[in-house]
Amino acid sequence: MIGIVALSRMTTLSPDRFLTPDEVKLVADRDLFRTKERIILKVRDLLMELHRVLREDLSRSTLLLPPEFDPSKVQFVKGEHLEHCPYQYLDYPKHFLGDEKCTFRSLCWWGHQLVFAMIVEGGHVKQYRKNFVDRFHHIAGLGLELSLAPTLWEWKQGEGYTLPITHDRKAQLAAVLSGRSRFKIARFLPLDHPAMREGRLPELGRDTFRSLLPLLRP
C-alpha cells in the first residue's frame, strides 16, 4: 500500500518538473564538470597570484588602517549560489571586526563579471570620506564606481546600483557619500575581458587596488 501511494504521488508531478532533453544532455556530460573544475582551479591560481602582489604592495604602503588590522589575514572563498551562479573571491587586505570593515574583495562572478571592490565601514570611514572629496580627482576617471545599494553585498552594476566616479560628478558623489557609515567603491569588468584570456587578472586587481590608495592614505 505504501508503494502504491508513493507511486501515485510521483505520477502527479507537473511536466515542468521533468528534465528536458537539453537538461539531460548537460547532466550526462562529464566533460562539462571536468571543464568547470579546471576553470575553478585556474581562477584560484590567479587569485593566489593577486594575493601575492597585493601583499607586496601593502608592505610598501603607509595607510590609515584599523588599529587591529592584521596584514597576514586573507580569505579565499568558492561558492555556487550567488544569484544561482558560481563565484570565487579573494579578500585581501582583509579586516572584519564587528561593525568595522576595511577589505579589498576580488570577485569572479560566473555568468556576470569581475568585480574589484574596496569595502569600508566604521573605524576611519569619516576620514576616508574626507579623503574621497579632498583627493577626488586622483580617483575619478579610472573606471571606478560608487555603490548606491543599501547593503555592502550587492554586486550588480548600473543604474540604481552604482554611480560612475567621473570628474564631472564630484558634488553629486560627495552628497551621496555624506554621512554614510559604510561604503563600497568598485571596478567592474566583463568576464570576456582580454585580461582573463591572457592571465592578467592579478594585474587588473593590483591596478584597481592602487587606484584606491588615495582613500586610505593618511
Segments (PLM) and residue ranges:
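Short, internal acidic amphipathic alpha-helical interface segments
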Residues: 123-178
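N-terminal amphipathic/basic-hydrophobic helices that include classical n-h-c signal peptides
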Residues: 1-9
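A structural detector for beta-sheet-dominated domains
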Residues: 93, 147-149, 188
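Mature, function-bearing regions of proteins
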Residues: 33, 37-40, 52, 65, ...
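Long, solvent-exposed, polar/charged low-complexity segments
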Residues: 11-58, 161-218
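Phosphate/nucleotide-binding catalytic core
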Residues: 11-14, 68-77, 110-113
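Aromatic- and glycine-enriched beta-alpha-beta binding-site module
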Residues: 81-141
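Short glycine-rich, low-complexity/disordered patches
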Residues: 54-72, 141-155, 215-218
